[in-house]
Amino acid sequence: MDTYQKTIGSRLMAFSFIVIVLFFILLYRMVEIGVLQHGHYLALAESQQRFEKTEMASRGRILVHDSVSDPNSYYPLSFDVKSFSVWAVPNQIRDKQKTATDLASLLSLAKSDIFNSIDNSKLYIPPLKRGLTLDQANNISNKNISGVFIMPEYNRFYPEGTLASQLLGFVNADGVGNYGVEGHYNSELTGKEGNVVGEKDTLGRMISMLSQTNPQNGTSYVLTIDRSVQYFVEQKLAKAITDYQADSGTVIIMDVKTGGIVAMASQPSFDPNNYKETANTDPAKFVNPAIANLYEPGSIFKPLIVSSALDSGVLTPETEGVFDKSVNVDGYTIHTAENKAFGRENVAQILQHSDNVGMVWVGDHLGNDLEYKYISKFGFLDKTGIDLDGETAGRMPALKQWRDINRATITFGQGVSVTPLQMVAAYTALANNGKYVYPHVVDKIIYPDGSEKQIAKQEGEQIVSQKTTETVREMLYSVVQSGKIIKSLTQGFKVGAKTGTAQIPKADGGYETNESNLGIFIHSVIG
């Protein structure tokens, strides 16, 4: 009996001890939760009652004028279209096989691809599909699939397809502008997201709003591009490439008074609506050759050298020389293009005949220092600063590296590499009484609040005198009158222009050749 009572007593004491220990543990937890971690659990409770929703902002539009349809209206070349994307949180999906089956039919995707994407326990995976219509989004939402949700977003749309595509650039799937206007003005075009913070009940319904920040749409830009002129230029360029079996081509039209680019076209181009296809097949098409591709300009460089000689006073239009069909410089023989001796010529006739040997003589009168100085003043050693992504500066040996052969070949546009836009900008100085005007593509800025800002032209320095430009313009007019092709195309207009042909230089020296080891040439006309 005593043994039994002792056993019972021991057990009661042990039980009491355990109860007391548990009591103190429970008491500690209550103090910890209610006092020590009160803030943490209060925040957790509030977070379960709160919700936060992001409101998307629309990217700014890119607009142009149209001198034919309505000069006072704007026409969009790039704007946002609201669409939807479908997302999944794999660790919240209860039946992944069924989910993959349901989504495959709704999204027109392979069931296996969907299943492979969601067959994990991740909290985040990339969207299963973007660019859904409202009907598609509603069909998925109505299924109430666990772990699958719809997000509104904006997709960039280019209503004119390939028109001015390399000037515009494109917007990628993450909403980031690449190349062209889209890339250059990406931060301004991109709007600021808004958000709503509120409280919800146990069923997830909003019962009060705590704060709201409205989305701010992006800034819009009106370009200097004329839609009808751009379309006309692209059609003519495409036909010329086909007719002459050329690999590519570029056309730039610039307002010589304002610097505004009226048209800028290159072929081949791409459709920014389908930029992914181009990225996979030929991403080089994204690059705008008008501002990025370097080439040796050839004879279209000659009027700029003549302008330099006249402006510096080392020659006059009537200064004469006698020229053979070739000349030797530093051991190199330079020929006229037709291997023909033009004999006695004045400066105007040298330009009219496009005489390489005569141009070497012009360069001799200029000398290294003056020739280099004027080439720099015409802007060939720097970027033009146009408001487009991807511009390249011209290239030419440093003055201290020049020999006589450098000075000689540069007078007829070889040994110097430029972009098409640099050439156009330099020629606009000749048309603008010697004043350089910086090229640009934005005409007006439209801010999210509706206010507008007109972009003023930006003038550079006086490169040559007005008298010099008047003289050279008359020379270029004579060049057109003495020719046949340009003259026949410009009846009724007084046009000054110059044609040029040059080989394509290789990075390691020499010139590009085709499979038959024949030179590859670039043909140009400017005026």
Which residues are covered by each model-predicted region?
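Periplasmic/cell-envelope proteins involved in peptidoglycan metabolism and beta-lactam response
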Residues: 1-276, 369-381, 488-491, 497
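Beta-lactam-recognizing serine transpeptidase/beta-lactamase-like catalytic domain environment
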Residues: 65-66, 75-78, 200-210, 251, ...
